């Protein structure tokens, strides 16, 4: 009986030793290297986001992606040696969502549809994007090393800001103005580094004054080498009589609930602004403020029923948190 017990203990010890060796072999087969990421926000934005997400995608699908949320200043990660494509973007945005994150080629930022506004037609529009800062690296090699690799990175804003003022007559008959822009990028391919237009108008709020309407809106940046955003539907682009056009749409909801619509082609001005370039300090050159020609005013027809004596309630057009970026008055031709 004693011999049986002794034999069992010897067998158990041998199994534990083999398990330990096997586990050590596995760890040796899958080593990791330390990566220390430092993020520089100087000249990017004064209003830092909450933090960033960093994703290492193995090249050619060899291995698993390494994914971690870091502070806005960066942090350390453990990454197996190999060749990777990398994306970095800020998280906890208000309107921006992420999809297609399973691969470097498909990860994309977008905004959802404008549901819940209670205004007919807005459910087909999408929200304007808030601030998004990204970095994409097509190939980065991580060597096997016990030394921590330091990576100094700087993200770039991929959301462009615009403003415009349009003179109009008959605004006393208007309760609300709904604005949208069609033809700008409403989503952004982070890995590919380009904006994409899916033919969904981008909604924005409009402020109604005595004789003009003003608004601020945002859109994802377009690819730098192109003057127009890439369309998702080739067939729609080929059959459209206004392919590539960027159209500003204003819907004047009058006091009798009827709607009068005005459309303005701003293609040439948008293209010029997208290619404004940078100054000697490396910052974007401020675009010129262009006054609206008097002959291009919009006139809202008088409704069949008298306006509300208390006055119509317009949608607020104030936007907080705008920095010294691209704010421009667009002309109407």
From Swiss-Prot:
Region of interest: Disordered: 274-333
Lipid-bearing positions (S-diacylglycerol cysteine): 21
Bias kind Basic and acidic residues: ranges: 294-304
Signal peptide residues on this chain, from the entry's feature table: 1-20
Major location (coarse): membrane
GO cellular component: cell outer membrane
Domain of life: Bacteria
Segments of skewed composition (Gly residues): 310-320
Location in the cell: Cell outer membrane
Keyword line: Cell outer membrane, Lipoprotein, Membrane, Palmitate, Signal
Keyword Lipoprotein belongs to the record: yes
Lipidated positions per record (N-palmitoyl cysteine): 21
Annotated membrane topology: Lipid-anchor
Purpose: Putative fimbrium anchoring subunit.
Family: Belongs to the bacteroidetes fimbrillin superfamily. FimB/Mfa2 family.
Protein name from the UniProt record: Putative fimbrium anchoring subunit Fim4B
Organism per entry: Bacteroides ovatus (strain ATCC 8483 / DSM 1896 / JCM 5824 / BCRC 10623 / CCUG 4943 / NCTC 11153)
